[in-house]
C-alpha cells in the first residue's frame, strides 16, 4: 500500500495499493478511452481484465518505470499537487541496497523536480508516532519485516534485523492452503487480491497454536464463511490462524529463519546490556501485518518465555499502527528542527544522488 498526504495531518489523504495494471486483452471498442496502464484503486477495480504488477518486492523497488507511475499518480491524481512546489519525505526499509536509495533520490529531483527531499527509516517513524524516543519497533508490512532498536532517538544499525517474510507471503500461503484443502483455485493476480481480503477480514493469531488446532478439529466454532465476488460462499476453518502462524513459525513457508518473536529477541540481545530493559518495556508493533487480532498477546507470551524471568515486558500495539509510519512522517516533516535536515535541490546538483547516504542516515 502507498500512503500519501500532507505534513501536519493526522492521517494520510490517499491510501492505495502499490500496483500497476496493464490490459491483458486487445481493446475492441473505439472511443472507450482505454489506457495502457492503471494505478492503485483503478487497477484494483479493473483487475479482472488486467495483469497486475507489483513494482516493490520485499521492500525493494525492482521496476522503476512502474514506481514512477505510482509516484506520478500520487502527486497528480491523489494529492493534486505540483511536486516542484513541495518538499517530499519518502520512507525506506532499513538494510535496503544503497542503489535503491540513490535512484529514489534521483527520480525525485530529476523527474519530479522537487525543491527538497528526505528519506526516513520506516520503523523510526513508527516510534515517533507512538510518542517515544526509546524502544524496539517490529515493523511488518507487505514485503518485509524488520526489528529496529532505537535508543534516545538513535537507531542502532548493528542490531537491526530483517526478515523477508511479510503480508504478501502470508497471502500466498493462504492461497496455497485454501487450494490444498478445498480445491478452490486462486491463481491469477486478481484472485490473489481476493485472498488478501479474506486474510485481512478473517485471520487471527492463536495464543496457543496446538490447542487452537485441537479446538478447530473437534468443533465448527472457529469456522467463518466468505462470499466470493461471483456469489459462491466458501468456509474457512483452521486456515484462519494457520496463515498468520507462519510469522511465528516460518518453517510453514519452508523458510529457515526465526519467527518474529525470536527476531525481536535477537535484535534486543544485539544491543548493549544496559539498554535492553528499556527495549523490552517498549516493544512497539507497526505495519499492516501486525493488525491480526491476538498478535500482541502472542508476542507478549513468546518474548516472556525467551527473556530473563524478572524482566518487565510490554508490547505496544497502537490501534492506528497500520498507518503509524505515515503518521510519524507527518510529525517529523512538520517539526521546525527538521527543516534543516532536508536535502535541497542545490545540494543534489552539487553532490549527485550519493548525498542521500550522508544526509539521511
From Swiss-Prot:
Assigned protein family: Belongs to the actin family.
Positions of modified residues (Tele-methylhistidine): 58
Subcellular location, record wording: Cytoplasm, Cytoskeleton; Nucleus
Organism superkingdom: Eukaryota
Disulfide bridge positions per record: none
Subunit details: Polymerization of globular actin (G-actin) leads to a structural filament (F-actin) in the form of a two-stranded helix. Each actin can bind to 4 others. Identified in a IGF2BP1-dependent mRNP granule complex containing untranslated mRNAs. Component of the BAF complex, which includes at least actin (ACTB), ARID1A, ARID1B/BAF250, SMARCA2, SMARCA4/BRG1, ACTL6A/BAF53, ACTL6B/BAF53B, SMARCE1/BAF57 SMARCC1/BAF155, SMARCC2/BAF170, SMARCB1/SNF5/INI1, and one or more of SMARCD1/BAF60A, SMARCD2/BAF60B, or SMARCD3/BAF60C. In muscle cells, the BAF complex also contains DPF3.
GO cellular component: actin cytoskeleton; cytoplasm; nucleus; protein-containing complex
Modified residues (Methionine (R)-sulfoxide): 29, 32
Organism: Chlorocebus pygerythrus
Modified residue annotations for N6-methyllysine: 69
PTM entry text: ISGylated.
CDD domains recorded: ASKHA_NBD_actin
Single GO term (MF): ATP binding
Additional information: In vertebrates 3 main groups of actin isoforms, alpha, beta and gamma have been identified. The alpha actins are found in muscle tissues and are a major constituent of the contractile apparatus. The beta and gamma actins coexist in most cell types as components of the cytoskeleton and as mediators of internal cell motility.
Reactions catalysed according to its record: ATP + H2O = ADP + phosphate + H(+)
Protein name: Actin, cytoplasmic 1
Function: Actin is a highly conserved protein that polymerizes to produce filaments that form cross-linked networks in the cytoplasm of cells. Actin exists in both monomeric (G-actin) and polymeric (F-actin) forms, both forms playing key functions, such as cell motility and contraction. In addition to their role in the cytoplasmic cytoskeleton, G- and F-actin also localize in the nucleus, and regulate gene transcription and motility and repair of damaged DNA.
Gene of this entry: ACTB
SMART domains found in the cross-reference section: ACTIN
Entry keyword set: ATP-binding, Cytoplasm, Cytoskeleton, Hydrolase, Methylation, Nucleotide-binding, Nucleus, Oxidation, Ubl conjugation
Amino acid at each position: 500500500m502507498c500512503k500519501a498526504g500532507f505534513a501536519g495531518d493526522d492521517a494520510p489523504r490517499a491510501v492505495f495499493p502499490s500496483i500497476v495494471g496493464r490490459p491483458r486483452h486487445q481493446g475492441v471498442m473505439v472511443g472507450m478511452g482505454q489506457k495502457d496502464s492503471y494505478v492503485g484503486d483503478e487497477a484494483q477495480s479493473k483487475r479482472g481484465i488486467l495483469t497486475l504488477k507489483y513494482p516493490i518486492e520485499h521492500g525493494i523497488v525492482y521496476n522503476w518505470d512502474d514506481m514512477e507511475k505510482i509516484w506520478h499518480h500520487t502527486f497528480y491524481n491523489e494529492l493534486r499537487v505540483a511536486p516542484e512546489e513541495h518538499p517530499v519525505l519518502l520512507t525506506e526499509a532499513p538494510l535496503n541496497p544503497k542503489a535503491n536509495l540513490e535512484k529514489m533520490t534521483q527520480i525525485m529531483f530529476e523527474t519530479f523536480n522537487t525543491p527538497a527531499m528526505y528519506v526516513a527509516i520506516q520503523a523510526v517513524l513508527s516510534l515517533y508516532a507512538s510518542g517515544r524516543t526509546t524502544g524496539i519497533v517490529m515493523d511488518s508490512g507487505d514485503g518485509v519485516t524488520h526489528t529496529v532498536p532505537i535508543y534516545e532517538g538513535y537507531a542502532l544499525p548493528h542490531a537491526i534485523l530483517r526478515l523477508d517474510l511479510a503480508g504478501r507471503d502470508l497471502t500466498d500461503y493462504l492461497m496455497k492452503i485454501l487450494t490444498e484443502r478445498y480445491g478452490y483455485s486462486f491463481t491469477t493476480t486478481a484472485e490473489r487480491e481476493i485472498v488478501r481480503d479474506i486474510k485481512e477480514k478473517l485471520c487471527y493469531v492463536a495464543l496457543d497454536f496446538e490447542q487452537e488446532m485441537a479446538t478447530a478439529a473437534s468443533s465448527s466454532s472457529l469456522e467463518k464463511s466468505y462470499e466470493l465476488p461471483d456469489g459462491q460462499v466458501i468456509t474457512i476453518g483452521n486456515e484462519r490462524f494457520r496463515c498468520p502462524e507462519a510469522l511465528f513459525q516460518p518453517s510453514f513457508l519452508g523458510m529457515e529463519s526465526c519467527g518474529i518473536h525470536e527476531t525481536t529477541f535477537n535484535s534486543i540481545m544485539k544491543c548493549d546490556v544496559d539498554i535492553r530493559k528499556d527495549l523490552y518495556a517498549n516493544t512497539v508493533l507497526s505495519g499492516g501485518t501486525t493488525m491480526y487480532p491476538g498478535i500482541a498477546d502472542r508476542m507478549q507470551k513468546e518474548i516472556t518465555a525467551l527473556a530473563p524471568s524478572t524482566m518487565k515486558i510490554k508490547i505496544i500495539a497502537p490501534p492506528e499502527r497500520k498507518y503509524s509510519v505515515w503518521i510519524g512522517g507527518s510529525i517529523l516533516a512538520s517539526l521546525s528542527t527538521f527543516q534543516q535536515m532536508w536535502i535541497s535541490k542545490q545540494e543534489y546538483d552539487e553532490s549527485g544522488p550519493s548525498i542521500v547516504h550522508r544526509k539521511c542516515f
